[in-house]
């Protein structure tokens, strides 16, 4: 046992040394790709539509990557980049300053970042008609990519494969998971699909919108008058959704957010304990005031590609990858990705989650305590609408407290799990759980992937 422990420590030291030696001082990025540690490529998913992916092999010093799961991370928006934000701001091996991240998931899983839908991050389209306009197209494109990936990387075909997601990425993950299950059953894709995790996910938009008023009122961010205003616009959103007027519902959703901003003095939709930091240059433009979609895009996509991250991705990272076309800039098409999905925003996918549960797919829902845009109350609301036969038994269970380590006395989360449904309440976290509570997010990932 002592010899094994020493070997692990030596391997870990060598691994950290190899990472550090790969960087020069300052912001320049000139590390050498380590054999078998990282690979990336494009896949043509449709005519005029190319999707970019980036794979990191797990770096656990005591285990081979084949002994650990493969996790695909899907960012939100739509239009948020997994290879950028998810990688360098949340779970990847390095942060935006290219410093090692202590809570990287790469210790316990190989990580596959995909810029999805097409037009996101380094993915791109050659014509405007090639942007995805609905979840069906998003899922179909991903099937093309996953088939290509698993066909080319057969070493991952038997490794447990999990899809983790965030925000709108969760809505896409639900649809992708269902299509992936079908493809596996039909034999068109070979992989060991083991579950999907929906993080602060836009599964039932109207349930989120309806919960905003009561949630903000309960934490003293709305008074009676403000609650009445928010509740009124939320009912208008509900009516539009019930009538199938999804584009109108999207416009009303944008209006609801403006009403909340005015009544809360600019609460941050991603963490209620902070205030939003608007882009004043954007807000001074005529387009910003005329278009609710532009305002929504400003709030829900542009914050995923701040100046530091954009400079990193379009500078050192683009130079490292070598395969990005000269005329493609990271994040340049993200606004078009967002706007193209306008009619899809407010459509619920509770039925898809229900189908996944019925098929026996492991489904995990996790949510940050301080999130507003997809608050926990709204998540709990749509979960209670599931037709899954085991829901009553799930509800009868008492949740269990979780701690980041055995010696900690501070509660970091709660979890409830029955058969193939689990729900995690992550404390002191906003919308981006791994960014806010990295240790707990890592522990949760290990629990979901059955490593704890």
From Swiss-Prot:
Glycosylation sites: 64, 102, 126, 192, 362
Conditions for induction: By retinoic acid.
Enzyme Commission number(s): 3.4.16.-
Cellular component aspect of the GO annotation: extracellular region
Domain of life: Eukaryota
Cross-referenced PANTHER family: RETINOID-INDUCIBLE SERINE CARBOXYPEPTIDASE, SERINE PROTEASE FAMILY S10 SERINE CARBOXYPEPTIDASE
Protein name per Swiss-Prot or TrEMBL: Retinoid-inducible serine carboxypeptidase
Organism: Rattus norvegicus (Rat)
């Amino acid at each position: 046992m002592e010899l094994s422990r020493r070997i692990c420590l030596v391997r870990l030291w060598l691994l950290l040394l190899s990472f550090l030696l790969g960087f020069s001082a300052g912001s320049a990025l000139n590390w050498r790709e380590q054999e078998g540690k990282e690979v990336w490529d494009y896949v043509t998913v449709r005519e005029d539509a190319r999707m970019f992916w980036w794979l990191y092999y797990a770096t656990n010093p005591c285990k081979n990557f084949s002994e650990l799961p493969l996790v695909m991370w899907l960012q939100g928006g739509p239009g948020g980049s997994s290879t950028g934000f998810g990688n360098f701001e949340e779970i990847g091996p390095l942060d935006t300053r290219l410093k090692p991240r202590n809570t990287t998931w790469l210790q316990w899983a190989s990580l596959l970042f995909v810029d999805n839908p097409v037009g996101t991050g380094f993915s791109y389209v050659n014509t405007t008609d090639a942007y995805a306009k609905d979840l069906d197209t998003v899922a179909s494109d991903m099937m093309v990519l996953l088939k290509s990936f698993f066909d080319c990387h057969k070493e991952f075909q038997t490794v447990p494969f999990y899809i983790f997601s965030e925000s709108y990425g969760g809505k896409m993950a639900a649809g992708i998971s269902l299509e992936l299950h079908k493809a596996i059953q039909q034999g068109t894709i070979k992989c060991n699909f083991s579950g999907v995790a929906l993080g602060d996910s836009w599964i039932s938009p109207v349930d989120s919108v309806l919960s905003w008023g009561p949630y903000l009122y309960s934490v003293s961010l709305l008074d009676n008058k403000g609650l009445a205003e928010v509740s009124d616009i939320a009912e208008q959103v509900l009516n539009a959704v019930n009538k199938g007027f999804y584009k109108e519902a999207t416009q009303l959703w944008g209006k609801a957010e403006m009403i909340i901003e005015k009544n809360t003095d600019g609460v941050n939709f991603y963490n209620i304990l902070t205030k939003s930091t608007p882009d004043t240059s954007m807000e001074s433009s005529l387009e910003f005031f005329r278009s609710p979609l532009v305002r929504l895009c400003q709030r829900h996509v542009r914050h995923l590609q701040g100046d530091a991250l954009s400079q990193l991705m379009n500078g050192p990272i683009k130079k490292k990858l070598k395969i990005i076309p000269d005329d493609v800039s990271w994040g340049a098409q993200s606004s078009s990705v967002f706007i193209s999905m306008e009619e899809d925003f407010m459509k619920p996918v509770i039925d898809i989650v229900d189908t996944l549960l019925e098929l026996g797919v492991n489904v995990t829902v996790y949510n940050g305590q301080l999130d507003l845009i997809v608050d926990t109350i709204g998540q709990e609301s749509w979960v209670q609408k599931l037709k899954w036969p085991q829901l009553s038994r799930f509800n009868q269970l008492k949740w269990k407290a979780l701690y980041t380590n055995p010696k900690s006395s501070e509660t970091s989360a709660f979890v409830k799990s029955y058969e193939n449904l689990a729900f995690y309440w992550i404390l002191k976290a906003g919308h981006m759980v791994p960014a806010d509570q990295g240790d707990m997010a890592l522990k949760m990932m290990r629990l979901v992937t059955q490593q704890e």
